[in-house]
Structures are given as structure tokens and as C-alpha cells.
UniProtKB/Swiss-Prot annotation:
Pathway: Isoprenoid biosynthesis; isopentenyl diphosphate biosynthesis via DXP pathway; isopentenyl diphosphate from 1-deoxy-D-xylulose 5-phosphate: step 4/6. This is 2-C-methyl-D-erythritol 2,4-cyclodiphosphate synthase. Keywords: Isoprene biosynthesis, Lyase, Metal-binding. It is an enzyme of class 4 (lyase). The lineage of its organism: Bacteria, Pseudomonadati, Chlorobiota, Chlorobiia, Chlorobiales.
Amino acid sequence: MRIGIGIDVHQFAEGRKLIIGGVEVPSPIGLLGHSDADVLLHAISDALLGAAALGDIGKHFPDTSPDYKDADSMELLRHVCKLLEQEGYKPVNVDTMLLLEKPKIAPYIDQMRRNIARCLGLEINAVSVKATTNEKLGYVGRQEGACAHAVCLIENA
């Protein structure tokens, strides 16, 4: 068994959809990025890649490549799962924490968990998505961006 940790940050921008955990969350602003900027799925991808010592998402999906322009991060996560499988690993569980002031995402957490569980081939009780504010401190508190942390456990397939 191996443990991985991932973190991702994206700034907010006008004219972008807010996609978190594969769910489009109603919001007047979204997250800026080369792909769909799904901060939660990016953190999970990094955690899984790290657990298998396969580098990070920047190595596998560079933001300089037109191939990943506006990419669906759920598809990127599926690719990460294939990389794990090729190395003889499979995910066991994922625990995540999302930091943002607004909008409140509690109504969307169950769907995020279902999306992630389905993508990783896990039962929903093996996927945790939590959210908190930053108590108005720092870039998250000023509503300039969002941050996600993820920890995962993988095992030999």
C-alpha cells in the first residue's frame, strides 16, 4: 500500500464555468485554467500519481499542450487511473478538502463523491469530499481563488 498527497489552486475568473468534482456548480464566476480547472480532480490526480511515484499532472498533462486546452478533468483522472493500472496499482480510498468562501457547495458534495467513486472504480464510502472556508484569510478568503487538498491510498492490483 502507498499513500499520496495532492494540492491544487486556481484563481477565479469571469466568464468561466465553476466545475468541481465533475459537477457544474452555479456561480457567477469560475476557475481559470488551461483545462476546465477542476481544482478537486486535479488534487486527486496529483495524489494518485504521487502515490505511484509517477510524477504530477503537469508532467502528464502540460498546460503548454493544446491537447489539454479546455480538457475535461474527469477524463484526465480516468487517464491517471489507467496509468496506475499499467503500474500494477488500484485506488483504495480518497479523502479531500476543498477551500473556498463562495459558493457553498454542500448541496453538490454527494454528486461529486459519486462522480469520483465511479471514475476510480470505488464504492462511494471510499471517497470523502469536505469543504471549508478560509475564514476570510488569504487569497481564498478574499475570494480570489480556490484550493483543494487530496490524500489517497493505493494498493497492488
